[in-house]
A protein has these predicted regions:
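Short coil/turn segments at secondary-structure boundaries
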Residues: 9, 78, 100-101, 116-123, ...
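Residue-level detector of family-conserved "landmark" positions at structurally sensitive sites
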Residues: 8, 40, 76, 97-98, ...
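Conserved, charged catalytic cores of large soluble enzymes
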Residues: 1, 103, 107-126
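Second-shell residues forming the walls of enzyme active-site clefts
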Residues: 1-76, 81-83, 89, 94-97, ...
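C-terminal non-catalytic regions of proteins with extracellular/luminal or membrane-system context
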Residues: 15-17, 34, 50, 81-95, ...
Length: 375
């Protein structure tokens, strides 16, 4: 019963990194609170104390203090092993403390029955279950319920009759992998799925419209803008511990050709759907930005499409596909920034937020816009 494992964060409390906080881990957690489980560091906590936080002079002292504080499992610090051995040989670390950590790991495995049944991955079950129809149906239902229609001046639902033309525009309108969000196989933290999840299992917003509209209703696509360019980290190819540094995402340069193509497509259409937001290089662990503004050419794209909507009277639906709060331009939310205001923003008829809706997210978004699902 209860929690079997705690993972320790990178943060410091009162100047003491959590990984080395003996009072918190041993005196309070294991002592006063009688915690019987194991403690595991986050990715390279011990190593980062040497090469990033610079609170430990070397791996020998870092390993010593990590074990003394009460850590059991040291995640992804290759130098910990030699550092701990050197600490024992130099009299800095009592070997009995290592024995205690090992005993807690073994005790957890015994409680879970892993020595009798290691519960290794079942390849046949993996192929049969992961991405199964039940999984896809569940994701679709969750996506339908998670998408929020923040503003609608009456443009939705849109009636996609055979004589209509729909322009689906934006850098995320047909971006299968970024629709899934962080930690989904090609997030930058791992390289075992460099091409991401299987494309044929993902329904983008563009896919969703093409699947749902009746025969004769034309759906066209323009990228319209780029979000980021990936560049080498100026700090070098590898971290000081030898692990590779991922590329850094910087705001993409404005591309007039992409914008012109999108505007031309929008002018000829009866409905304009703009899908904007962020990508995995801008969110999650090790990735943050100094602004919540849309990056790259996205604001310019939205303003141009809003102008088309004003000139032609055609509805513009803006979809924010993002896993964090973002600052939207006035053409989407109005000059007062109050999206629940009854008056329409200048050029935008409807605005919806889809927080990384997953493999069937594009279908859910298209269903809501076309009136097949209640938001």
């Amino acid at each position: 019963e209860g929690c079997g494992t705690f993972m320790l964060g990178y943060e410091s409390i009162d100047g003491a990194p959590v990984t080395f906080n003996k009072w918190l881990l041993s005196d309070k957690l294991r002592g006063d609170w009688n915690y019987q489980g194991t403690l595991i560091t986050d990715w390279d906590n011990v190593g980062r104390s040497v090469w990033e936080q610079k609170v430990k002079p070397d791996y020998m002292h870092a390993a010593t203090d990590a074990v003394k504080a009460g850590n059991d499992l040291i995640m992804t610090t290759p130098q910990f092993f030699d550092g701990a051995i050197k600490a024992v040989r130099n009299g800095l670390l009592d070997e009995s403390l290592i024995d205690e950590a090992v005993s807690r790991i073994l005790a957890l495995k015994f409680r879970l029955g892993l020595f009798e049944d290691p519960r290794l991955p079942d390849e046949k079950r993996i192929k049969a279950v992961i991405g199964s129809k039940d999984h896809q149906d569940l994701n679709l239902q969750i996506a339908r319920e998670s998408v929020a229609l923040l503003k609608n001046n009456g443009a939705l639902p849109f009636s996609a009759t055979p004589d209509k033309r729909i322009a689906v525009i934006g850098p995320l309108a047909d971006d299968a992998q970024n629709q899934l969000g962080d930690w989904t196989g090609n997030s930058g933290q791992v390289n075992w799925m460099p091409d991401g999840q299987p494309r044929d299992m993902i329904t983008t917003v563009l896919d969703g419209f093409r699947q749902l509209v009746p025969e004769g209703c034309e759906v066209v696509y323009s990228r319209g803008a780029d979000i980021i360019d990936l560049v080498d980290d100026p700090e070098g190819e590898c971290y000081p511990d030898g692990q590779p540094r991922p590329k850094i995402g910087v705001s993409a340069r404005f591309d007039q050709r992409l914008l012109d193509e999108a505007v031309a497509n929008a002018r000829q259409s009866d409905l304009i759907v703009a899908v904007v937001g962020d990508v995995v290089q801008l969110v999650g662990e090790t990735c943050s930005t100094a602004t919540l503004e849309l990056l790259g050419g996205q604001n310019a794209l939205l303003e141009a499409l809003a102008n088309v909507a004003k000139e032609t009277g055609k509805p513009l639906v803006v979809v924010l596909l993002s896993s964090k709060p973002q600052v939207m331009p006035a053409c989407v939310i109005g000059t007062n920034g109050v999206i629940v205001d009854e008056s329409a923003a200048d050029g935008t008829s409807a605005f919806m937020w889809a927080p990384n809706p997953g493999m069937k997210g594009g279908q859910a978004i298209a269903e809501i816009i076309l009136g097949k699902t209640e938001p």
